[in-house]
Amino acid sequence: MSLSVFDLFKIGIGPSSSHTVGPMRAAVRFVEGLRREGLLTATTCVKVELYGSLGATGKGHGSDKAVLLGLEGEHPDTVDTETVAARLQEIRGNGRLNLLGEHSIAFNEKEHLAMIRKPLPYHPNGMIFRAFDAAGLQVRSREYYSVGGGFVVDEDAAGADRIVEDATPLTFPFKSAKDLLGHCVKYGLSISQVMLTNESAWRPEAETRAGLLKIWQVMQDCVAAGCRNEGILPGGLKVKRRAAALHRQLCKNPESSLRDPLSVLDWVNLYALAVNEENANGGRVVTAPTNGAAGIIPAVLHYYMRFIPGSNDDGVVRFLLTAAAIGILYKENASISGAEVGCQGEVGVACSMAAGALCEVLGGTVQQVENAAEIGMEHNLGLTCDPIGGLVQVPCIERNAMGSVKAINAVRMALRGDGQHFVSLDKVIRTMRQTGADMKSKYKETARGGLAVNIIEC
């Protein structure tokens, strides 16, 4: 299966790629199917059931809100985040949904949107959408699964190897890190050059570069918003946003702070906190590769652009291409879903992607890039997903800052070596998948274990 850099990096809305972006995409796909089959105007009722992890933590992750917006025709990359609250208030206050913005039906959330903790067979993040006509007859029903990073598959793809419906032939196909590095060594290419060549199967190189710089701009906008916005995050935990205050501290006396040899890490922490606070607030973010881990790649990329001499837009493009190549390996051979393998599949994967990407733009060999990516995951193995209150706040926000610093340190270790390392990237990916399979479900985005049950919500 062919995956693009833009499958890994998607502009979306917080707080969760699997629990917000995925359900919104599934909902709009369902109603678009109604219109395509000529059933939209005949529909008088839509019922939605969210299963497994979606049912357990969907409220905290905004899955219910995402479904309502998706049924009204909104897409994660274009929905106006400033008007979401008002839109939802109108839907709930009037008791009506405007399907695709063109067909109004009655909607009672208590009757028509159910959250069920029991999972469907294929994946912990399952959904069933049903449409009925005026006679109460079911006219359409579809199952969807949000499999991480905003990826959605329907019941026809469930259980199959297919991730997205794309069989585009690539110049340098790869299913493993061994394959990827083999292309690099054989043709004298970097990982980013392999990816850029493959991207030409879908679009001209100039379009790919422009698209990646747009992704980078959204990341910068997200950091800027996080450094500007203050207050309490939604959801009931009363978590205070910290990035704006930290930003003021760092800007107040930047010269004196740089006398501290570790002060750069304060900026890295800031970038990660800013992104994940925006994400927790339902703001505009880039899946990288998920929303729960969306702060790591922007933080490390900001570190590169601000603190590395000679950094430029070409480096940004190379960084994102390399990160995507590594992310594809995890997506195809393991998982990037916290509900499937725990947080090692989100923060762990993002750390690995960022480490490999930074290593390339700092001049690392392909062997050193692989080493950095492997280190990034090896020391996140077993990381649980246990969000307090089902919210993407504690421990998620700080965990992105820790993952960002860990990625930078992984690169420093790799660049001090010759590229030879004991554990291969393929082996650590396989280990992550096996560890996730062995992990109890209470540690996989259900809010029924770990910090989620040991910290009292106040």
Feature-to-residue mapping (PLM):
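Conserved phosphate/anionic-ligand binding catalytic regions in large, soluble enzymes, centered on
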Residues: 9-27, 281-300, 341-352
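Alpha-helical support elements that line or immediately flank enzyme active sites
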Residues: 18-35, 298-310, 355-363
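Short, mixed-charge aromatic SLiMs
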Residues: 45-58, 90-97, 246, 319-333, ...
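C-terminal regulatory domains involved in ligand/effector binding and gene-expression control
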Residues: 76-256
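Hydrophobic alpha-helical bundle architecture
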Residues: 311, 322, 328-401, 413-422
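Extended hydrophobic packing segments that form well-structured cores
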Residues: 422-458
